[in-house]
């Protein structure tokens, strides 16, 4: 798949073409599957919920969950990936706890999908594996790009929500999809939907809004440009090697390696150059 962006400015024209997937950056290789662990600041009434490791994987950290294109199965013609599991920290030995930062016993944690930004016309989907047929999945709900008041939720805790129950949860089988290539930004928060708090309400107050990147396919998420310099930012995935190449002529191209090879690591990466050329074309390639 190819994405092309023409950017004229100050008499200077640079075209960017994405031919594969790209990555440049100093970070070390990361695993493709992560766990975001939900807990609370403490276990008292009205203590706020949070992701104990959210700062490692949110947009401020530049981490991206990669979605790869597929043309078969439940996710045919979609970008799909299961690179993140939303978990809840355990309070009991039976579930491997007590973990530091766990929510109060009796809390039932859910993740609310609030907002979505990304490529125009894109739709983000949340799917669940079919227990009776593990080879297939069914759609739970979608979030169109531009939504800012979403109310859909998925359970993070696995308990029955009864008083004193461990808030622990660790459920695999969820897949996330996108209909268009590009960088998607999910806004989400953790809720306690139990009725075991004061007055029959929740024990904990909601978390703040977390923002997470999902990179669908090989695209350039942003670029910067001045009179003699150009920079691009793009998402990556582990297990790939990346090259940034450039040429001054597309009719008779002589592609030269501008940066790379670099290992992918599931973080947004940046490449910048200084050039006096009036026209340059860049492409991003992986193998």
Predicted segments with their positions:
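Boundary at the C-terminal end of the N-terminal hydrophobic targeting segment
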Residues: 20, 29-31
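Short, hydrophobic beta-strand segments
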Residues: 174-178, 272-275
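Beta-strand-rich extracellular modules
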Residues: 189-195, 285-287
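Contiguous segments within soluble domain cores/interaction surfaces
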Residues: 32-173, 194-217
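Bacterial N-terminal signal peptides
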Residues: 11-23
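N-terminal secretory signal peptides that target proteins for export/translocation
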Residues: 1-9
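Short, composition-biased motifs enriched in small/polar/acidic residues
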Residues: 217-287
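Short tyrosine-centred short linear motifs in exposed loops/low-complexity segments
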Residues: 172, 180-184, 240, 278
């Amino acid at each position: 798949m190819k994405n092309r962006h023409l950017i004229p400015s100050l008499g200077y024209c640079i075209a960017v073409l994405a031919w594969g997937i790209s990555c440049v950056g100093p970070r070390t290789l990361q695993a493709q599957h992560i766990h975001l662990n939900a807990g609370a600041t403490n276990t008292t009434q009205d203590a706020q919920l949070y992701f104990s490791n959210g700062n490692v994987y949110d947009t401020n950290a530049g981490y991206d969950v990669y979605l790869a294109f597929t043309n078969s199965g439940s996710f045919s013609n979609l970008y799909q990936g299961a690179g993140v599991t939303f978990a809840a920290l355990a309070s009991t030995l039976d579930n491997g706890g007590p973990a530091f930062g766990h929510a109060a016993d009796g809390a039932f944690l859910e993740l609310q999908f609030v907002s979505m930004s990304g490529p125009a016309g894109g739709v983000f989907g949340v799917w669940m594996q079919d227990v009776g047929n593990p080879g297939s999945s069914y759609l739970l709900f979608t979030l169109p790009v531009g939504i800012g008041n979403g109310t859909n939720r998925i359970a993070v805790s696995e308990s029955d929500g009864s008083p004193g129950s461990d808030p622990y949860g660790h459920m695999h089988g969820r897949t996330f999809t996108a209909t268009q290539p590009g960088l998607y930004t999910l806004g989400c928060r953790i809720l306690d939907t139990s009725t075991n708090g004061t007055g029959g309400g929740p024990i904990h107050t909601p978390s703040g809004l977390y923002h997470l990147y999902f990179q669908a396919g090989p695209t350039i998420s942003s670029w910067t440009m001045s009179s003699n310099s150009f920079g691009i930012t793009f998402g990556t995935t582990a297990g790939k090697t990346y090259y940034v190449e450039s040429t001054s002529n597309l009719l008779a191209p002589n592609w030269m390696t501008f940066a790379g090879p670099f290992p992918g690591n599931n973080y947004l990466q940046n490449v910048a150059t200084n050039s006096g050329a009036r026209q340059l074309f860049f492409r991003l390639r992986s193998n």
